[in-house]
Amino acid sequence: MAYSNILVGAGTRPAQPVVRRIGIADLQEALAKGIDDFYAMPTHAMFLCVIYPIVGLFLARLAFGYSILPLLYPLASGFALVGPVAALGLYELSRRREAGLPTSAVRAFDVLGSSSIGAITALALLLLTIFVIWVALANAIYIATFGYATPTSIENFANEVLTTRAGWTLILVGNLVGLLFAVLVLSISVVSFPLLLDRDVGAAVALLTSIRAVARNPFTMMLWGLIVAALLVVGSLPLFLGLTIIVPILGHATWHLYRRVVEPQAAPPPTHDEGHRERRYAADFPAVLFPWAR
C-alpha cells in the first residue's frame, strides 16, 4: 500500500491536473516573480544554495590534481540534472509566500514533512540515477576519443580538446548526449516537484503531468530550458559564486512557472449531497422528527 501511495498518491483515483498552453509572456512573468521572491527572501535563498559554490570550488580544486579534469565539465553541467531536487526548499518558500504563510529559513525544510515526501524521494532518486548515468557516459565518450591517458596539465588538456579532431569530436558528441539528458530531465521535472509540494498526486501522476506540460508547450518549454542553461553558465563563470543568485531566482521562478502551466486545483466536492439522499425514515428515526437539528 505504501508503494502504491508513492506512485499514485493517497487517493485511489487521483485527479489528473489540467495543463494550460503558455507563451513567452508567461516565462517573463515567472522570472519576474522569481526575482521578486529572491529580493523578498535573499538570505533564505542564499542560505539554501550556498552548497552550489562550495561544490563548484571543491570540484575546481580537485581538477588541479588532473585525475578528474576530463570530468569537470560533465560534473558541473550535470548538477543541472539534479537541480530540481536542490531547489525543493525554494519552491516551498515561494509556495508559502504566495499563500501568505511565514517564510523563515527553517520553513524551507517543511518539505521533509510533506505528505508527498515518498513520491518526492522517488523522483529525486530517479534524477540522481540519470546524473550518474550521464557522468558514466561522459567518461566513456572521453575514453573513446582520447583513451585512458591522464592530462598532464590544464593547458595540455585545453589544447588537446580545442585544437584536435578528437577534441572537437568530444565536444560535439558530449554536448549532443548532454542535450538529450537535459531534455529528458526537463520533461520529467519541470513541474513535477512543485506539483508534489502542492498536491499529493503521487510520483507517476506528477511525472506524466510534467511530460504533458512539455508536450503541449514544446517551444516555450525548450526556451525555458535554454534560459536555465544560459543563466547557469553565466552564474558558473565567476568561480561558481554567481550561482548563489542564479539558482535561487530560477528555483523561485520554477514555482511560478508551475502556477502558470498547471491549473489550480478545484475545490473538492462534498462527500455527500444531503438534498439528493434517498430518505429512509425508519433508519433516520427519531432524527426525522427533528429536521431542524440535522
What are these regions (language model features)?
Residues 1-294:
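Hydrophobic alpha-helical membrane segments
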